[in-house]
Design a protein with these regions (language model features):
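Sensor-1/coupling segment of RecA-like P-loop NTPase cores
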Residues: 122-149
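Conserved AAA+ ATPase "SRH/arginine-finger" region at the nucleotide-binding site
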Residues: 158-171
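Structural recognition of the conserved hydrophobic beta-strand(s) that form the central parallel beta-sheet
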Residues: 68-69, 103-105, 133-139
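Short regulatory helix/loop adjacent to the ATP-binding pocket of P-loop NTPases
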Residues: 81-84, 142-157
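Conserved AAA+ ATPase "sensor/coupling" helix adjacent to the nucleotide-binding pocket
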Residues: 158, 173-185
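Short glycine-rich substrate-engagement loop in P-loop NTPases that contacts/grips substrate
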Residues: 58, 63-101
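Pre-Walker A (pre-P-loop) alpha-helix and adjacent loop at the N terminus of AAA/AAA+ ATPase modules
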Residues: 2-35
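Walker A/P-loop nucleotide-binding motif
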Residues: 28-51
Length: 198
């Protein structure tokens, strides 16, 4: 289970960690910490932080409705809903619109999919107007996503947090967390050199 307690943090990711924790703590406070954008290369802990927010809210604030989806799940849901709307003309994506906190991982994967980008802009705009909360993760900063300027502006309006490459010492701490502590000293130093991008 991904939690804030088992997330290994240091100088490279402390801003993202503390911002995610603050976001979870203030999720029921309208107009505060409305959006959070966490970015960095794959494998550096972004998904862990997003799921930590989700799990923290589920445990401590179950009354807050949360939707977590990676970009592929969002795309699949949107296509399914578009097909359903053709048959029933009913409102779509209620599982997204009806929540208090929306968490989307790997948003870069919707680049180039015009209908999906346009709909996500509408969705995010609605959340911001209604003082709901949005958390986004991507592999690069908003300015480097080459997305619609309106959506980039929405991303930039919130808190931006970089998760940087871990140092040698940081990798060692991560390996200590996931190895048997009694064997960590010998095993971790042996493997740390091969964990770039962990």
């Amino acid at each position: 289970k991904f939690t804030f307690e088992n997330f290994v943090f240091g100088p490279e990711n402390s801003l993202a960690y503390r911002s995610a924790l603050k976001f979870a703590m203030l999720a029921d406070t309208p107009g505060t910490c409305t959006s959070l954008f966490i970015y960095g290369k794959s494998g550096l802990g972004k998904t862990h932080l997003l799921l930590a927010i989700k799990n923290e809210l589920a445990e401590k604030s179950p009354e807050i409705k949360v939707k977590y989806a990676n970009s592929q799940a969002y795309l699949d849901d949107l296509m399914t809903e578009f097909d359903r709307q053709k048959k029933s003309n009913a409102p779509i994506m209620q599982a997204y619109h009806g929540v208090d906190v929306l968490i989307i991982d790997d948003i870069q994967n919707i680049i180039g999919k015009r209908a999906s980008v346009d709909y996500f802009f509408q969705l995010m705009d609605e959340f911001i107007r209604n003082n709901k909360k949005v958390v986004i993760a991507a592999d690069r900063a908003p300015k480097d996503l080459n997305m619609d300027e309106r959506l980039t502006s929405r991303f930039n309006a919130g808190l931006l947090c970089l998760v940087a490459e871990p140092s040698y010492e940081m990798k060692y701490k991560i390996l200590q967390r996931y190895y048997d502590p009694r064997q960590a000293t010998t095993r971790c130093w042996r493997h740390t050199g091969a964990t770039a991008g962990i």
